[in-house]
Regions:
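OB-fold nucleic-acid-binding modules
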Residues: 86-105, 190-413
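Extracellular Ig-like/FN3 beta-sandwich strand-entry sites
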Residues: 12, 47, 59-63, 164-170, ...
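A short beta-turn/strand-edge loop motif at beta-sheet boundaries
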Residues: 23-27, 115-121, 163-164, 355-373
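C-terminal edge beta-strand
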Residues: 73-87, 179-196
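Short solvent-exposed strand-capping/beta-turn motif centered on an Asx-Ser/Thr pair
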Residues: 20-24, 57, 112-118, 229-231, ...
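A short beta-strand micro-motif common to beta-rich folds, especially ectodomain repeats
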Residues: 52, 60-72, 153, 163-178
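Predominantly extracytoplasmic/ectodomain segments of secreted and cell-surface proteins
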Residues: 1-20, 77, 88-114
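Surface-exposed binding patches on compact interaction domains or structured appendages
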Residues: 1-5, 12-51, 113-154, 247
Length: 413
C-alpha cells in the first residue's frame, strides 16, 4: 500500500488507497467495532485501489485495520485507519499522593475522567516483596476495592496492624485509547501506623546532621516539609554527566529536584531512582517521608543530597506559586553554603558578554546536532560590587536558545 497509517477527521468520508502487488490477495477488516469502515473490494490481483468509506464519529478516537493477505506467497500487510472523535478522552488525577488513616476506611481521590472505569486496567503495587496484581486477585492486600463515582475514585482500605511502621501502596490506572496509546495515572497511598501516626516531622537542620560523605541511611519514620524550588520540565536541574566523549546521561536532570525549608534557610538536592519518581512540581509545598533514603554530605562547598526518594514517599503535595516562597535577596558576596539548593534573588547583576544565547556553542557538538559532546555551558555574571560567578545552563534546557536576546543593563537574577 502507498501508506500504512491514515489519520481521518471525525466527519464521514471516503478514501482511495493504492496497493502495489504482483500477487492475488484478499482484503479483510479487523477491529471494526460498530462497522464504521466499509471496503468495496474483498480480493484483488496485482496493482489496484481500495475504495474505503467511513462513518461520522461522535465518540472517542477509534482505529480499524485493513489486512491484506497473499496466501500463495505467504505475504501480508496491514493498513491502519485512525479516526479522530468528537470527544477527547479525559483521564487525570487531581493529586498523585494521598494519606490514609491507620484505621483504614474509605479514601476519595478526585479523578477527572470521561471514560468508563470498566475500560481501565487497575493494579496495586505494594512496597513489600508482595507481587503486584490486579485488585480483584489480591485478596491479602490492604487495598480492598476501587470504584468510581461522581468524579472521585473511591478506595476501601484495611487497618494497619503495625503500631510503628507506616506502609505504602501504588494504585496504577491504565487506559488504552482507541489508537492503542497507553495512558497511565498513578496514585501513591501512604497509610499511617496503628496509632494513626505518619512519623515524626524533623527540621532540615536535623536531617543535615544525619549526613556523612558515605551516605547515612534513614531507618526511622521521619519526614520533612518544604517548598519545591526547581522546575523538572526546564531541563536545567541537576548536572548531566558526560559518561564518554560522545555520550551524556541526560536523565540526571530529570531525576533531580531542589527543595528548601519553609523559612528558606536550608535546601536539599533530591535524587529519585527513576524519572517517573520525580513528581515534584515547582512552588508546591510537599511533605516527604525519609525512611529508606540516604543523606549524603558533599564538601567544598558544603551541601546535602537526599537520594532514593520515590514517588510513594511524598506524603502530600499542595500546588503553589512563586509568591508562596520566602523572600531572600542577597548580593553575591553575602552568599553562604547554606544558600545552596534554595531560592535566592541576586541583586544588581549583569551579563558582561551579551552576544548570542545563554549557550553560544557550536550546536554540531551538542544534543541538537546529535553529537552529545557538550553537557552544559557557563555564562559569566557579575554584580555592582565587582563580584562574579558563572551561570550553568544544560544543553537540554528549553530556554537556552529560544531566540530571546540576552538582557542589557543590570537587574535582579
Amino acid at each position: 500500500a502507498d501508506g500504512k497509517t491514515y489519520t481521518l477527521s471525525s466527519d464521514a468520508g471516503d478514501l482511495a488507497i493504492k496497493v502495489y502487488s504482483n500477487q492475488n490477495y484478499n482484503i479483510a477488516l479487523e477491529d471494526n467495532n460498530g462497522e464504521w469502515v466499509a471496503v468495496a473490494e474483498r480480493n484483488l490481483s496485482g496493482d489496484g485501489t481500495l475504495h474505503v468509506e467511513y462513518d461520522f464519529n461522535d465518540g472517542f478516537p477509534r482505529m480499524a485495520k485493513i489486512c491484506l493477505t497473499a496466501t500463495s506467497a505467504n505475504l501480508s500487510d496491514t493498513i491502519y485507519l485512525k479516526q479522530k472523535g468528537v470527544k477527547t478522552p479525559t483521564f487525570k488525577l487531581a493529586k498523585p499522593n494521598m494519606t490514609v488513616h491507620g484505621y483504614g476506611g474509605e479514601v476519595r481521590a478526585e479523578l477527572d475522567m470521561n471514560v468508563d472505569i470498566k475500560d481501565l486496567h487497575i493494579s496495586v503495587d505494594y512496597t513489600s516483596d508482595e507481587a503486584a496484581m490486579t485488585v480483584l486477585d489480591k485478596e491479602d492486600g490492604w487495598v480492598r476495592d476501587i470504584t468510581y463515582e461522581n468524579g472521585f475514585l473511591i478506595i476501601q482500605t484495611d487497618p494497619n496492624p503495625d503500631e510503628r511502621a507506616v506502609r505504602t501502596a501504588t494504585v496504577n490506572l491504565v487506559y488504552i485509547d482507541g489508537w492503542e496509546v497507553e495512558n497511565k495515572q498513578q496514585l501513591f497511598l501512604m497509610q499511617a501506623n496503628a496509632k494513626d501516626e505518619l512519623g515524626v516531622e524533623v527540621s532540615f537542620i536535623d536531617v543535615r546532621n544525619l549526613g556523612d560523605t558515605d551516605g547515612m541511611k534513614v531507618t526511622d519514620d521521619i519526614y520533612i516539609t518544604g517548598y519545591v524550588v526547581s522546575d523538572r520540565n526546564s531541563g536545567n536541574v541537576g548536572d548531566n554527566i558526560q559518561t564518554t566523549q560522545n555520550s551524556i546521561d541526560y536523565t540526571i536532570a530529570q531525576k533531580t529536584a531542589y527543595i528548601e525549608s519553609l523559612d528558606g534557610r536550608y535546601g536539599f538536592c533530591i535524587e529519585t531512582p527513576t524519572v517517573d519518581d520525580n513528581t515534584f512540581s515547582r512552588y508546591s509545598k510537599v511533605q516527604i517521608l525519609l525512611k529508606g533514603t540516604k543523606v549524603i554530605l558533599q564538601e567544598d562547598p558544603e551541601r546535602y543530597t537526599i537520594s532514593g526518594v520515590t514517588a510513594s514517599m511524598v506524603m502530600s503535595s499542595t500546588e503553589g506559586t512563586a509568591s508562596d516562597l520566602p523572600v531572600k535577596e542577597k548580593y553575591m558576596r553575602d552568599l553562604t553554603d547554606e544558600d545552596i539548593y534554595t531560592y535566592v534573588t541576586l541583586k544588581d547583576c549583569e551579563l558582561p558578554v551579551r552576544k548570542g544565547s545563554l549557550t553560544p556553542i557550536n550546536e554540531g557538538y551538542a544534543n541538537a546536532g546529535g553529537a552529545h559532546r557538550c553537557a552544559k555551558y557557563a555564562t559569566l555574571m557579575r554584580d555592582i560590587n565587582g563580584n562574579s560567578m558563572y551561570i550553568y545552563t544544560n544543553t537540554p534546557c528549553l530556554y537556552r536558545r529560544d531566540g530571546t536576546r540576552l538582557p542589557y543593563g543590570s537587574g535582579n537574577m
